[in-house]
C-alpha cells in the first residue's frame, strides 16, 4: 500500500511540475503573441470583421516584425490588422512572403518583445506548448502535446511543404501561425494547420526554417531559396551497410547540369555540405540556406560505392535560385 501511495504522490508531483512550467512558459510569451486579421476596414474596433479563413495567430520575431502563416493572404494589397491580447489594434504591412514554408513577415510600428527562435531541430518525443488566438472570441487558447514525428509532407494552400513536424496536440481555428514552444519558452516551430481533419493532431514548421528565412530576408530584402533538384532519403540501414556514420542517399536527380558537371549518381551518399556533416534532411536544407547567407558556392562531399569519396562544386547560378 505504501508503494502505491508513493507512486501516486510522485505522479502528482510530476503533474504539478508540468502545470507550473506551462504557466511559466505562457506568462513569458503571452505579450509577444497577437492575432492577424485580413480586413477591409481601417483597423478600428468597429471595422474589424473576422472569418476563420482570414484570421491567424502571429508572434514577434523582432521588435517591429511579426511572423505568421501566408495562407490567409490573397494578395499583397490585403489590409492586415494586428490585435494584441490586451486589446490594442494596429496596422501591419507585408514585408515578404515565403510561400515554400507558408511564412509571412509583417512590419509594424508598435514594438513588443520578440521571442527567441531556436535554430536546431527538436527531437521526437519532446514535450511542447503553444498559445494562439481563438477565432471568433479573440482570446488566447493554451495547448500542450508531444512531437510525434518528423519529416512529414503536407499540401497547404496548394503547395507541398516537406519536413514538417507532426504534433499530438489539439488546436482550434485561428491558431495557425502560433509559436510552438519548448520548456525554456523558446520557439521551436510554428503551427501551420490541423492534420488529417482531426483537432488532436497538428502540423508545425521547424523553427530553423523560420530563423534562416528571416536572416535571408534581412540580408537580401526578400526570401529566396536554392533548389538543387535532388531527391534525398534518410536511410540508417544503408549507412550501416556502407559503414558510414552520417549522410543522405540520393534517390533521384532532376538537375541535368548537376548530373553532368559532378558525375552524381543515384545511390551516392551526400556526407557533407560546405564542411558541415549531414545527418538529416533538415541539416541539408539548413546548409543550403546558409550558402545563400554566406554568398558562397556549394561544395558537396559524396561517397560512391564505385569511386569512393568525391567532391562536387556547385555554383549558385547553376542551381535553381528562386
Residue ranges of predicted features:
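Gly/Ser-enriched beta-turn/beta-hairpin loop segments
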Residues: 45-50, 95-101, 150-165, 216-223, ...
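Conserved PDZ fold ligand-binding element
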Residues: 63-67, 188, 259-282
Amino acid at each position: 500500500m505504501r508503494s502505491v501511495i508513493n507512486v501516486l504522490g510522485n505522479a502528482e508531483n510530476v503533474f504539478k511540475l508540468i502545470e507550473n512550467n506551462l504557466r511559466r512558459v505562457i506568462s513569458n510569451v503571452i505579450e509577444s503573441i497577437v492575432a492577424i486579421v485580413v480586413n477591409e476596414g481601417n483597423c478600428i474596433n468597429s471595422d474589424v470583421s473576422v472569418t476563420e479563413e482570414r484570421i491567424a495567430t502571429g508572434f514577434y520575431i523582432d521588435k517591429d516584425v511579426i511572423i505568421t502563416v501566408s495562407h490567409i493572404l490573397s494578395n499583397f494589397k490585403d489590409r492586415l490588422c494586428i490585435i494584441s491580447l490586451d486589446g490594442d489594434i494596429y496596422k501591419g504591412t507585408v514585408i515578404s512572403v515565403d510561400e515554400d514554408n507558408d511564412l509571412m513577415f509583417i512590419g509594424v510600428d508598435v514594438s513588443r518583445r520578440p521571442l527567441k527562435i531556436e535554430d536546431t531541430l527538436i527531437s521526437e518525443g519532446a514535450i511542447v506548448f503553444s498559445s494562439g488566438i481563438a477565432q471568433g472570441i479573440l482570446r488566447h487558447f493554451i495547448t500542450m502535446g508531444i512531437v510525434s514525428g518528423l519529416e512529414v509532407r503536407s499540401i497547404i494552400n496548394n503547395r507541398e511543404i516537406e519536413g514538417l513536424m507532426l504534433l499530438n496536440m489539439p488546436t482550434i481555428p485561428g491558431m495557425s501561425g502560433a509559436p510552438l514552444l519548448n520548456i525554456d519558452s523558446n520557439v521551436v516551430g510554428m503551427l501551420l494547420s490541423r492534420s488529417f481533419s482531426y483537432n488532436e493532431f497538428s502540423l508545425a514548421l521547424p523553427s530553423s526554417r523560420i530563423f534562416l528565412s528571416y536572416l535571408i530576408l534581412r540580408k537580401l530584402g526578400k526570401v529566396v531559396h536554392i533548389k538543387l533538384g535532388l531527391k534525398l532519403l534518410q536511410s540508417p540501414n544503408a549507412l550501416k551497410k556502407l559503414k558510414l556514420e552520417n549522410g543522405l542517399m540520393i534517390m533521384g536527380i532532376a538537375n541535368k547540369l548537376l548530373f553532368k558537371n559532378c558525375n552524381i549518381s543515384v545511390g551516392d551518399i551526400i556526407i557533407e555540405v560546405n564542411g558541415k556533416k549531414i545527418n538529416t534532411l533538415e541539416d541539408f536544407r539548413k546548409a543550403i540556406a546558409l550558402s545563400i547567407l554566406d554568398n558562397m558556392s556549394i561544395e558537396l562531399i559524396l561517397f560512391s560505392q564505385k569511386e569512393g569519396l568525391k567532391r562536387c562544386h556547385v555554383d549558385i547560378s547553376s542551381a535553381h535560385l528562386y
